[in-house]
């Protein structure tokens, strides 16, 4: 059986994304519009208030007030009041099946066009990421319950070695399994849902014909590819074939092409841009109907590709994990989040072109960029060090980590890392969403002055520490420290006293949180009073506060396991 061989690049990325799509998540209140109202029966049947994962990697606004969230453990939405998790189906869904529930899995991609929405799902088999398919709806604002069409992860048949596209046929290695075939990005434009599925390559789904097709792109050594002409080889049964072309997403050392590993995609009008493990591809879709003689018409339906890569075209790095289109003053800028691939001299950062790919520039070098969001002159870059904003693409300012400044809120995003951002312009004053590994936050303006934060609450009334076990070297990394958070529930006085004891009940740390002044999470960075990290072991936290208006402050105890 011909299948795609797992490569080192696939392995390393799958490990990263597995960590990305696992975690804990999310609940809260917001002041966004209230025009959308979920019916109670829908809440009870298909939605559960709060979320199951703090990891939020996708944010899409839709209609007057809906905001859809792609989390590490499923699909979620904010309806203008509260956050809900979409319930999942434990049963295996069939290709083309209508369903009110969605598949289990993390959400690597959400695409929206009007009321049409597509959501991709993924998981793992213990060794590698696996594509769980896509759900598609044409009425994403249906308050009586959305009807989804489930599309299984597209794969090829073993015999699919010669496929039609454009003005002829091309040869390919069939991708027959969902392993490493994960839809990491998707976009809706015109008649098509475009998907970038790594080993599954670039594919598009015709929304009317309800059919998938593979979309061939240039091989690694090609700077262009025409699917409109050049099909000069003829098979024994008369098919016109592209000579010397082979679609193969294996590694180059195994006969394949990094440029056939699609990871990011945007489409608009007659143009599609695709980021791969070997740069950026620009496709111009040609559709012409010409009358070649009276009553005889010739239809031309194809794509002309241009391929840009490091070092020849000036990209920062060839592994392009995110793409965005900016339209400002009549000029289109294409932004590409670039990582190292396999060529010496590559760097992380942003690559961009303002002249349709003719020339490329770089900025934010050495930053690990996940996603880019644009609006008019504004560019937002979501990175491992935080959210950056620019008005010109050259000068950048970084937001401080999100903190809820409301009195007694004591909520905070305890991570530098921002996976994604989204501008919400549906009210008079635009708002800003960010998705992180520690929840999702909504700013009341684009400046980040005041945040509402939504995070998982496992038990709203219990006192507990999380994550637990806790590693100060890897968990909740913020400004050089790692943190464990203490959940207290409602606090009815203005002081919280935190004491940390080792297993011998010797006090190693103490802090008083004056809630009249302090804003942020009740937390500990795993350090003792001297500033040094404590040793591995079991620790006990004593937290003193008043849990109701009619009670004096009292001590609450919880246990923490520190493992560096």
Per-range role (PLM):
Residues 44-76:
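Beta-strand-rich domains and repeat architectures in extracellular enzymes and scaffolds
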Residues 44-48, 87-101, 146-177, 215-255, ...:
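Surface-exposed loop and turn segments in beta-propeller and other repeat-based domains
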Residues 66-69, 117-119, 192-195, 271-274, ...:
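Conserved beta-propeller blade signature
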Residues 74-76, 130-136, 201-203, 279-282, ...:
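A short loop-to-beta-strand structural motif that recurs across blades of beta-propeller domains
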Residues 416-462, 471:
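Blade-level signature of beta-propeller repeat domains, shared across WD40, Kelch, NHL, RCC1
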Residues 459-499, 524, 549-551:
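Glycine-centered coil/turn sites that cap beta-strands in beta-rich domains
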Residues 496-508, 539:
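Short, glycine-anchored, charge-dense loop/turn motifs used at functional sites
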Residues 540-564:
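C-terminal tail/sorting-segment detector
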């Amino acid at each position: 059986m011909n299948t795609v061989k797992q490569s080192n690049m696939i392995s390393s990325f799958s490990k990263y994304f597995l960590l990305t799509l696992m975690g804990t998540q999310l609940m809260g209140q917001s002041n966004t519009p209230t025009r959308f109202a979920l019916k109670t029966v829908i809440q009870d049947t298909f939605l559960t208030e709060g979320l199951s994962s703090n990891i939020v990697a996708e944010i899409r606004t839709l209609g007057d007030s809906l905001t859809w969230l792609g989390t590490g453990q499923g699909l979620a939405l904010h309806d203008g009041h509260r956050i809900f998790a979409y319930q999942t189906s434990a049963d295996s869904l069939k290709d083309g099946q209508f369903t009110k529930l969605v598949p289990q899995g993390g959400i690597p991609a959400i695409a929206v066009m009007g009321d049409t929405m597509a959501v991709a799902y993924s998981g793992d088999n213990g060794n590698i990421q696996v594509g769980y398919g896509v759900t598609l709806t044409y009425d994403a604002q249906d308050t009586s319950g959305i009807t989804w069409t489930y599309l299984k992860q597209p794969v090829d048949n073993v015999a699919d070695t010669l496929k039609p596209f454009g003005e002829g046929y091309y040869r390919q290695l069939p991708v027959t399994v969902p392993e490493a075939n994960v839809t990491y990005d998707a976009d809706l434009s015109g008649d098509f849902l475009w998907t970038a599925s790594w080993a599954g390559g670039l594919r598009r789904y015709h929304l009317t014909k309800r059919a998938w097709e593979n979309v061939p792109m240039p091989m690694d050594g090609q700077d262009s590819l025409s699917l409109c002409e050049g099909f000069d080889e003829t098979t024994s049964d008369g098919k016109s074939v592209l000579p010397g072309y082979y679609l193969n997403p294996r590694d180059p050392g195994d006969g394949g092409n990094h440029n056939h590993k699609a990871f990011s995609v945007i489409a608009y009008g007659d143009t599609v841009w695709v980021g791969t493990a070997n740069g950026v591809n620009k496709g111009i879709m040609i559709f012409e109907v010409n009358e070649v003689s009276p009553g005889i018409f010739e239809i031309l339906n194809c794509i002309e590709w241009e391929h840009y890569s490091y070092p020849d075209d000036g990209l920062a790095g060839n592994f392009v994990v995110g793409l965005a289109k900016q339209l400002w003053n009549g000029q289109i800028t294409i932004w590409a989040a670039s990582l190292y691939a396999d060529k010496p001299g590559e760097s992380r950062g942003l690559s961009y072109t303002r002249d349709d790919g003719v020339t490329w520039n770089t900025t934010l070098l050495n930053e690990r960029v996940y996603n880019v969001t644009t609006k008019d002159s504004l560019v937002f870059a979501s990175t491992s060090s935080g959210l950056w904003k620019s008005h010109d693409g050259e000068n950048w300012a970084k937001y401080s980590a999100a903190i809820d400044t409301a009195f007694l809120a004591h909520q905070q995003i305890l991570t530098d890392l921002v996976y994604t951002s989204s501008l919400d312009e549906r009210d008079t004053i635009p708002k800003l969403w960010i998705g992180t590994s520690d929840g999702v936050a909504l700013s009341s303006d684009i400046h980040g002055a005041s945040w509402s934060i939504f995070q998982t609450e496992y038990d709203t009334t219990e006192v507990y520490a999380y994550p637990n076990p806790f590693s100060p070297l890897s968990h909740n990394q913020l400004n050089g420290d790692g943190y464990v958070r203490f959940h207290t529930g409602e606090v009815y006085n203005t002081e919280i006293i935190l004491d940390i004891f080792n297993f011998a009940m010797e006090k190693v740390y103490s802090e008083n949180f004056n809630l009249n002044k302090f804003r942020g999470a009740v937390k500990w960075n795993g350090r003792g009073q001297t500033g040094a990290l404590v040793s591995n072991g079991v620790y006990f936290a004593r937290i003193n506060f008043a849990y109701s208006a009619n009670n004096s402050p009292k001590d609450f105890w919880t246990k923490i396991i520190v493992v560096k």
